[in-house]
Amino acid sequence: MNTLGHFLRLTTFGESHGSVIGGVLDGMPSGIKIDYELLENEMKRRQGGRNAFTTPRKEDDKVEITSGVFEDFSTGTPIGFLIHNQRARSKDYDNIKNLFRPSHADFTYFHKYGIRDFRGGGRSSARESAIRVAAGAFAKMLLKEIGIVCESGIVKIGGIEAKNYDFNHALKSEIFALDKEQEEVQKTAIRNAIKNHDSIGGVALIRARSLKRNQKLPIGLGQGLYAKLDARIAEAMMGFNGVKAVEIGKGIESSLLKGSEYNDLMNQKGFLSNRSGGILGGMSNGEEIIVKIHFKPTPSIFQSQQTIDIKGNECECLLKGRHDPCIAIRGSVVCESLLSLVLADMVLLNLTSKIEYLKTIYNEN
């Protein structure tokens, strides 16, 4: 499927080397002021070609809004938008058009559909994620109206892990590093991977918090069974290229603990810890929502690798082109956008949870 969300629905289209990629964001309430500066900044954060740690492919990524906005406000109708692909280099893929690149989607796409766009991976390329970031910017505009902000940074590159989390530093960092002290070591790990014609994995941390530091997030976002907030978050994140694991709160570490070590105790002021990552019973509990995203190493590496062609013959594959040495860096921005989309969707869903909410809306008339 090509659609994410239920009340706020994003449908995307387009391929890596097609003329355009685009999206339709349906369900956005009317009357939201469109923050064009925010939209542009979000696109720049994801943009390649900014430094030596991302893909050299640098697209302008100018978002062309085609519908759903009038005089700088959302109209309540579907917001349509396009991004033109201007710097694709399809010739880089001529030598692999009949080969399956190791650990790419080539093999599965070909066997499922019987045809594949070999140019940059076609629909399976992370190029499509530019649309998710644009849509996430619109979702952020909605969330800002009710005091919710999402932010992200890099926790780990290879085995080099941040010891301190500084989201303000991440915004200034070339690799969105959360820990200034570990940043140079993490950069060295990426440089070494590039030098060896290799790639490296990483972990991103995404969090949602109240816009006002002394306030809590809304309680009750999500549903108890089939629309659990953590399940929807995991679904959105796992739908992005290269994501192999998603943790909420303590995540994997939870399986090593006893209940007495894990439980978030409470007093009259609220929770004394946040090992649950801000979600209990599939619903937000008011604490910060904490999500860790584990990315595999970029499968596009510049080493000769054994593979097969579309006829099943064994052969060698040596890639050309422009690729990220570490998916996690720009992927952190995409996942931040995805969390924004999920939360905005859940905010709209929550309007149906109590009759008082509906009475407030309809009794005003």
From Swiss-Prot:
Residues at which NADP(+) binds: 46
Catalysed reactions listed for this entry: 5-O-(1-carboxyvinyl)-3-phosphoshikimate = chorismate + phosphate
Enzyme Commission (EC) number: 4.2.3.5
Biological process, per Gene Ontology: amino acid biosynthetic process; aromatic amino acid family biosynthetic process; chorismate biosynthetic process
One GO CC term on file: cytosol
Source domain of life: Bacteria
Entry-linked Pfam families: Chorismate_synt (PF01264)
Necessary cofactors: FMNH2
PROSITE patterns, per database record: CHORISMATE_SYNTHASE_1, CHORISMATE_SYNTHASE_2, CHORISMATE_SYNTHASE_3
List of residues binding FMN: 123-125, 241-242, 281, 296-300, 322
UniProt function note: This reaction introduces a second double bond into the aromatic ring system.
Similarity comment: family membership: Belongs to the chorismate synthase family.
Alphabetized HAMAP family for the sequence: Chorismate_synth (MF_00300)
Quaternary structure (record): Homotetramer.
Name assigned to this protein: Chorismate synthase
Originating organism: Helicobacter acinonychis (strain Sheeba)
Lineage, top ranks: Bacteria, Pseudomonadati, Campylobacterota, Epsilonproteobacteria, Campylobacterales
Gene name linked to the record: aroC
